[in-house]
Amino acid sequence: MAKAKFERTKPHVNIGTIGHIDHGKTTLTAAITKVLHDKYPDLNPFTPFEDIDKAPEERERGITISISHVEYQTESRHYAHVDCPGHADYVKNMITGAAQMDGAILVVAATDGPMPQTKEHVLLARQVGVPYIVVALNKSDMVDDEEIFDLVELEVRELLNEYEFPGDEVPVIRVSALKALEGDPEWGKKILELMEAVDQNIPEPQRDIDKPFLMPIEDVFSITGRGTVVTGRIERGVINVNDTVEIVGLKDDKITTTVTGVEMFRKLLDQGQAGDNVGLLLRGVKREEVERGQVVIKPGTTTPHTEFEAQVVILSKDEGGRHTPFFNNYRPQFYFRTTDVTGVVTLPEGTEMVMPGDNTSMTVKLIQPVAMEEGLKFAIREGGRTVGAGRVTKIIK
């Protein structure tokens, strides 16, 4: 009996299953938990298909998404795995990032090959920045012709190349989720082979704390005799007393200053790090020079922009969204991090209007610059009510 010890130090990676409906995403998810449970019973509970299939609903930025989370461990890693029952749930999850993915297992039925949703999921993975993909060629027990395997594999690799994934290098593993779930030892081995490919081909993500410092400003105070304090939750990186920072966004000029104090729960710290709610005391900055919605950053690491392309999902009427479609030149507010900025929407060519419940790409021109990079999430609001959510896919200027 192989024993792997549970270590909190194991690297943690977030993955998910993507692919066309009925190609076996949920069955594969269940099969992975079963095979890993059989191999390392003290580390892994088995999660049956039924439990994954009745995914609980979550609300992310007002959007209702059905999503299942399972956890499991290989010898070297701890995984959190997301699976969504419906195609619409996948699209919503990938755009809102309700469950962030460091990599994905693309499930393609060997009996069908790539189908329309396979394409859509790969395109979305590219647009929302899922960085790595491993392919599971499912239902391989139902194909006995080597030529069919070769053909399907070729199609999948071409599809990945088309969307700028390294299609020629991506591992393609032949599996039968159903047979593995039924306890067939040979097909069980193929699931372990798949997980080995995931271990080796989906790199550990960079932790938030290792990224360059960024803190969105939520509030600004003036403390007599000490200066100006900005408060917020550190999004990434670390900040030390006496670090030089820039304050950018909403205005044309940036401010460069020094952090003379870091406070948390009224205690002075030497350092604040990702996840901490802190107050930063800024040298020589007047209260009226900074405002909510700007960001404090490590100098030169983020720039403000006004024009970008985005992928968005629009709330349906039932989710509390709009009741009517919107058209070109729609002017809602875009809520980035801590503040709303009005923007003008240009719809893609050939799209006349967008209905509640749709997802679409769009170009947005903001009336004030916002510090952003590709992948940044935002909400679309009308008078404080969320009507959609999206993320930046490309910065124009």
Swiss-Prot record:
The keyword Endoplasmic reticulum does not apply. Residues 176-178 are annotated as: G5. Its EC number is 3.6.5.3. It comes from the Bacteria. Residues 83-86 are annotated as: G3. It catalyses: GTP + H2O = GDP + phosphate + H(+). It is an enzyme of class 3 (hydrolase). It is found in: Cytoplasm. The keyword Cytoplasm applies. Residues 62-66 are annotated as: G2. GO terms for molecular function: GTP binding; GTPase activity; translation elongation factor activity. CDD domains: EF_Tu (cd01884), EFTU_II (cd03697), EFTU_III (cd03707). One of its GO terms (cellular component) is cytosol. GTP binds at residues 19-26, 83-87, 138-141. Its main location: cytoplasm. Mg(2+) binds at T26. Transmembrane segments: none annotated. InterPro entries: EF-Tu_GTP-bd, EF-Tu_GTPase, EFTu-like_2, EFTU_2, G_TR_CS, P-loop_NTPase, Small_GTP-bd, T_Tr_GTP-bd_dom. Belongs to the TRAFAC class translation factor GTPase superfamily. Classic translation factor GTPase family. EF-Tu/EF-1A subfamily. GTP hydrolase that promotes the GTP-dependent binding of aminoacyl-tRNA to the A-site of ribosomes during protein biosynthesis. NCBIfam families: EF-Tu, PRK00049.1, PRK12735.1, PRK12736.1, small_GTP. PANTHER family: ELONGATION FACTOR TU, MITOCHONDRIAL, ELONGATION FACTOR TU-RELATED. This is Elongation factor Tu. The lineage of its organism: Bacteria, Bacillati, Actinomycetota, Actinomycetes, Streptosporangiales. The gene is tuf.
